[in-house]
């Protein structure tokens, strides 16, 4: 079928909201511990903030510019998308706050209470009064709003309190604003009579309790907390810039004061006159206003989880200790180990520590001549940055591509770039109009006799030791000569001038990766027509590229069996008769964020397997520098296939997409044991594969079940031996 209609696709933005709904489902899932559910509420809020700042902001820009062309998959115009987004987002936020109320009630039963000032006992009242006097009052600034003092330009995502006041001798009402200080904790832990109990109060409630102290001689008539979200979809103007770093620094200052795109107000404090005034000043449509039944901005729950949650073992997930492969343990010479064999690491089941030590050892090793690395997002106190700094200061040749345009990490990356340059590293920022999203490190080491040996790390995720504990990613440590040659040419291409090199093993975007994928799917179609065994399994964060989607539809129509594991946006619709009936799509949302990108093509038994920094998104194919690399080692292939096999039979955290685009939990059959893939993958990675669910005993009907059945047979054989 060559022509596909709008009904064969999901809209990108609405599909993202479906993903965030799946995040919200984790907060609603009573199988999860209470504090974990709180954390998912915070993740939902954080996700939605960024979505509005970037995606909705971009759509509003298009409307203001008079751009009303339908998008290329579902045919919705920017105006239609904004309307649909608003309706869906309002529904989800309403569900979020209903869930918040339910969870906080359950927490209260477990002696963790969120209190308002009227619920405090005498000791707590005295405590908050003193805290306000010594910690809060000195940093508050009341801002009058009148003809001579116009409504201020409030920072995006800052929490504020609108205050309606009247003088003692007048009936005339006046308006003032008080910003809730972001330099103070959002909540305060209160003294209790029992160490088993935890009582908390929010900073805005505490401020409102004593807000009259800011307006001597006036009576506070009403208060209304509110929060503005501003457009952060501000493209960097690189054309003609002599210094990209300085240009980006300049552009970043504008982001905090972009056009308002969303207003959140608290339902219990709602004052219609104040709301209408804010709506008028900010020039917002009714659909841009979110009236929430609880505290504004639930991202403060991250702090509750990290600080309070850790005190309650029964309210958080049991920690899964990551494994370290033999040969990469602390104290081992990593170069000696990697020279003997390639290592595949699957984070966070495998510790990220060997990757950090790989860079640290390279920085300290006198035989290392050069270190080259791409950095997209790193942690706040990055040991990798420190190691690269030390290496540069010791005289090693250090080349680092720091991506200054990594969304919301720009300021941090500018700081790292300056630090590395000061240390003597050669810092580059990539190509104009492209983001360098590749994850690659090259270490050049001299051996006895002057022979050079190259060590490479390739990955699907960032060099971020913090998120590596939460994101699932694949990493490869190798000395493979062809991969090493490709890595050398890749860095030379980034840092110098010249045409893109010819690769031995790599495929890269924006040049040839998309064509490579289209050709691989075409090959699978041809082989299926000849042998009848076509099979594609792909795992990624999102799929949006129309050309790849339609090529998958062609493959499905030809009879190729396709399984897609897509955590986030999925513009493809599976199960449509005559279009995608041979395609299945699942999404897994669990304790770890599924982040690895893996692509499997059966190829009539050849079984080609690749990992990449790229998703099947148009931006990855056209607007980013990405690397796709093959998995060549047979045991590594087996591990990755086994891992994907387990995910494809997950019946606890997997949701399948229906042909109408909606997601439902994978239904567990009667008497079928629970298969929570992330837990089982952890056991499998550690070699503890002893308890196989009985579901594997039925006749395998697809590639996934055949693979798991094979694993079970191997495990039983090992046990018998």
Swiss-Prot record:
The active site is at 437 (phosphohistidine intermediate). GO terms for molecular function: ATP binding; metal ion binding; polyphosphate kinase activity. It catalyses: [phosphate](n) + ATP = [phosphate](n+1) + ADP. SUPFAM superfamilies: Phospholipase D/nuclease (SSF56024), PHP14-like (SSF143724), PPK N-terminal domain-like (SSF140356). An intermediate of this reaction is the autophosphorylated ppk in which a phosphate is covalently linked to a histidine residue through a N-P bond. Its cofactor is Mg(2+). One of its GO terms (biological process) is polyphosphate biosynthetic process. Pfam families: PP_kinase (PF02503), PP_kinase_C (PF13090), PP_kinase_C_1 (PF17941), PP_kinase_N (PF13089). ATP binds at residues 47, 471, 567, 595. Keywords: ATP-binding, Kinase, Magnesium, Metal-binding, Nucleotide-binding, Phosphoprotein, Transferase. One of its GO terms (cellular component) is polyphosphate kinase complex. Its EC number is 2.7.4.1. It comes from the Bacteria. Mg(2+) binds at residues 377, 407. Catalyzes the reversible transfer of the terminal phosphate of ATP to form a long-chain polyphosphate (polyP). Belongs to the polyphosphate kinase 1 (PPK1) family. This is Polyphosphate kinase. It comes from Exiguobacterium sp. (strain ATCC BAA-1283 / AT1b).
């Amino acid at each position: 079928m060559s022509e596909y209609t709008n009904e064969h696709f999901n809209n990108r933005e609405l599909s993202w909201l479906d993903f965030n709904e799946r995040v919200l489902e984790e907060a609603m899932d009573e199988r999860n511990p209470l504090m974990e559910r709180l954390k998912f509420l915070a993740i939902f809020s954080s996700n939605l903030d960024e979505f509005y700042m970037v995606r909705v902001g971009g759509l509003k820009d298009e409307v203001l510019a008079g751009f009303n062309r339908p998008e290329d998959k579902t045919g919705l115009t920017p105006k239609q998308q904004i309307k649909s987004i608003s309706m869906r987002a309002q529904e989800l936020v309403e569900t979020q706050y209903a869930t918040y109320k339910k969870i906080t009630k359950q927490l209260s039963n477990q002696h963790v209470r969120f209190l308002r000032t009227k619920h405090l006992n005498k000791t707590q009242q005295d405590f908050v009064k003193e805290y306000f006097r010594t910690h809060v009052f000195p940093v508050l600034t009341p801002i009058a709003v009148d003809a001579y003092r116009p409504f201020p330009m409030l920072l995006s995502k800052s929490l504020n309190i609108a205050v309606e006041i009247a003088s003692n001798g007048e009936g005339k009402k006046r308006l003032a604003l008080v910003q809730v200080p972001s330099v103070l904790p959002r909540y305060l832990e209160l003294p209790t009579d029992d160490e088993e109990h935890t009582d908390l109060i929010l900073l805005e409630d505490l401020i409102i309790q004593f807000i009259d102290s800011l307006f001597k001689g006036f009576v506070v008539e009403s208060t209304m907390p509110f929060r503005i979200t501003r457009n952060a979809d501000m493209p960097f103007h690189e054309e003609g810039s002599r210094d990209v770093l300085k240009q980006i620094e300049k552009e970043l200052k504008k982001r905090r004061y972009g056009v308002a795109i969303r207003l959140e107000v608290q339902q219990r404090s709602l004052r219609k006159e104040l709301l209408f005034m804010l709506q008028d000043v900010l020039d917002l449509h009714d659909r841009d206003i979110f009236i929430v039944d609880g505290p504004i901005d639930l991202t403060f729950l991250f702090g509750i989880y990290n600080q309070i949650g850790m005190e309650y073992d029964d309210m958080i997930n049991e920690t899964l200790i990551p494994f370290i492969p033999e040969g990469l343990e602390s104290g081992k010479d990593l170069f000696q180990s990697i020279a003997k064999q390639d290592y595949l690491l699957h984070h966070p089941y495998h510790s990220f520590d060997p990757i950090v030590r790989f860079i640290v050892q390279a920085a300290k090793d006198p035989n290392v001549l050069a270190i080259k690395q791409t950095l997209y997002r790193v942690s706040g106190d990055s040991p990798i940055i420190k190691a690269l700094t030390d290496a540069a200061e010791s005289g090693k040749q250090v080349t680092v591509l720091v991506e200054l345009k990594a969304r919301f990490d720009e300021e941090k990356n500018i700081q790292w770039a300056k630090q590395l340059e000061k240390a003597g590293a050669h810092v580059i920022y990539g190509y104009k109009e492209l983001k360098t999203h590749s994850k690659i490190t090259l270490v050049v080491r001299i051996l006895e006799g002057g022979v050079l040996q190259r060590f490479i790390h390739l990955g699907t995720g960032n060099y971020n030791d913090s998120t590596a504990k939460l994101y699932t990613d694949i990493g490869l440590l190798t000395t493979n000569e062809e991969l090493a040659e490709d890595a050398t040419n890749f860095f030379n291409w980034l840092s110098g001038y010249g045409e893109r090199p010819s690769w031995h093993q790599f495929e890269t975007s924006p040049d040839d990766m998309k064509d490579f994928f289209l050709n691989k799917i075409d090959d699978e179609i041809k082989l299926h027509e000849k042998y009848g065994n076509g099979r594609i399994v792909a795992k990624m964060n999102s799929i949006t590229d129309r050309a790849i989607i339609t090529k998958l539809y062609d493959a499905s129509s030809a009879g190729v069996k396709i399984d897609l594991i897509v955590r986030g946006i999925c513009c493809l619709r599976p199960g449509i008769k005559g279009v995608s009936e041979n395609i299945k799509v699942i999404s897994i949302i669990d304790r770890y964020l599924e982040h690895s990108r893996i692509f499997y093509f059966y190829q009539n038994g050849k079984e080609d397997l690749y990992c990449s920094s790229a998703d099947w998104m148009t931006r990855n194919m056209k607007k980013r520098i990405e690397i796709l690399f093959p998995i060549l080692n047979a045991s590594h292939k087996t591990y990755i296939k086994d891992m994907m096999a387990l995910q494809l039979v997950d019946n606890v955290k997997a949701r399948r997409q229906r042909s109408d685009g909606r997601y439902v939990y994978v239904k567990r059959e009667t008497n079928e044991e629970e298969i929570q893939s992330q837990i089982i993958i952890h056991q499998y990675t550690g070699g503890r594969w002893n308890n196989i669910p009985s579901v594997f005993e039925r006749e395998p009907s697809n590639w996934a079940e055949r693979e798991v059945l094979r694993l079970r047979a191997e495990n039983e054989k090992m046990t018998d031996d």
